Every structure is written in C-alpha cells, then in structure tokens.
Amino acid sequence: MSDLDNIDRAEGVDLLAPFFDLTTFSIYVRNRSAQDVFELLSDYYQLVGDIIEEGNGKVVKFIGDAGLVAFPEDAVAKGVLALRKLKNEGDAWLADWDTPCKHRIKAHFGHVHCGRIGTRTSKQFDVFGETVNIAAVLQSNGLALTAQVFRKLDSSTRQLLKKHTPPITYILVEGAHADQ
C-alpha cells in the first residue's frame, strides 16, 4: 500500500508523476474483438498494478492502453526502478501476447494537488498540476525522466541511467533579426 492511499482530502504534495502508454496499440487492436481487447487489458492492468504497487506507487487511472501513476517523494528511487521493470518486463509480457506494442514511459517530479475527486457518489484519487502536465508532454520512445526526477535519485539508481540530449534544432526568428 502506498502512502498516497491515506490521502482523502485535497492536499499539496511533492511526488513522482509518470505517464505511460503502448506504442502501436490502436493499430494492434483494430482487427480484434472488443472482448479480446478487454481480456488483454484486464490482465495488463493487473501486471501494471503489481509492478507499480511493489515500488510503493499507486495507479491513479487507466485510459485504454495508457495510464497515470504516482509515487510519493520518499519512494522516487523505488518508483524509477518500478518504471524500469514495467518497461522491461511489461514489454516482454506484451511480446508473449504476440503484440508489437512497447511501453513509452515519461516521468516528472514536483508539486501536485491530489485527493479524492469525482461525482457525489463516486470519488477517486487523482493528481493535478503543472508536474502532471509536464510529464504528459515529454517526448519518449522508451523511458524518459526529467532532470527533477534524476536529482531525487541515489547514486546507485543514477548509474542505471544516461543523459540524452536531443539534437539542436533551429526555429524561426521573430522581431529585430527576422529581415536578415
């Protein structure tokens, strides 16, 4: 059980906020029955839950083949290891199901507002804030972590990662130098 399970009322906390989804999933399910997709995702959700909860995290929500999870501040290193496990073991699990899908995982660390929210009769834990938005728009073809996540890691976990700096791109100049 995660420390996040004890939050009932809205509060501000610092946490690791990862998003994940599966590459080529929409193509893969195109010629499959809804029942087949449901059975695959049912088993997949259990796999994800087991891995995330083992890292002291919480599955916030699933949306089809995608999801949002959260790890408390004191479990960032365990969370990164869980995400690594999800990438490696999850991709192997997907291959066993004969899917071409792979995990795309992106994570940011920072302040969020979280708690139970929803209709009068159905409230669920959720997280909101710029930290979540940053994680959502990160580019990744595998497992990507922001510098804010990296800074929270111990040296042994840092050694499992390498820095990736994207190539330089050029953009249109507006203003004083645009006429040259």
Question: How would you describe each model-predicted region?
Answer:
Residues 1-3, 141-180:
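Intrinsically disordered, glycine/charged-rich C-terminal tails and inter-domain linkers
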Residues 114-139:
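Catalytic-core segments of nucleotide cyclases and related cyclic-nucleotide turnover enzymes
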